[in-house]
């Protein structure tokens, strides 16, 4: 009798967990990895921001893609994935390799790659639960356009040190916003 009762209790608890929450809980290590990425981005700074004031530009970061009361956790994971993926791609270009120390870039790319692995796992879990793609097309497009503007800016400025400094600072802000979004969902859980 005891085994049947414990089986039913276990089944009830598992069902409640699936119903009461989203299927994906990013590990606490993911939050630590976010902080590591921000630290590494900070260490990439080679040029004083004050010497690049004339190069500043408003790239119109799509803050609404990372905020708003209508953004669900599953959609937020998709946006986080999109920001992380584009950050990885940006710092995997030849231009970034000529600007910064390769070992520091490798550490950054490794940290971003781990983030992508965690987020992809969560995306698969959420898509299985919801049965549909999670990212609103307008959020995805806004993030892609933002990173496209950064790429065009670098090309326009011929990948100058100040252009990379401006882009690095922009990416830090974007990544910081995405980290804050993730932390707000973690506090709600």
From Swiss-Prot:
It comes from the Eukaryota. The keyword ATP-binding does not apply. Residues 1-23 form the signal peptide. It is found in: Secreted. GO terms for biological process: adaptive immune response; B cell activation involved in immune response; defense response to virus; humoral immune response; natural killer cell activation involved in immune response; positive regulation of biosynthetic process; response to exogenous dsRNA; T cell activation involved in immune response. SMART domains: IFabd. This is Interferon alpha-C. It comes from Bos taurus.
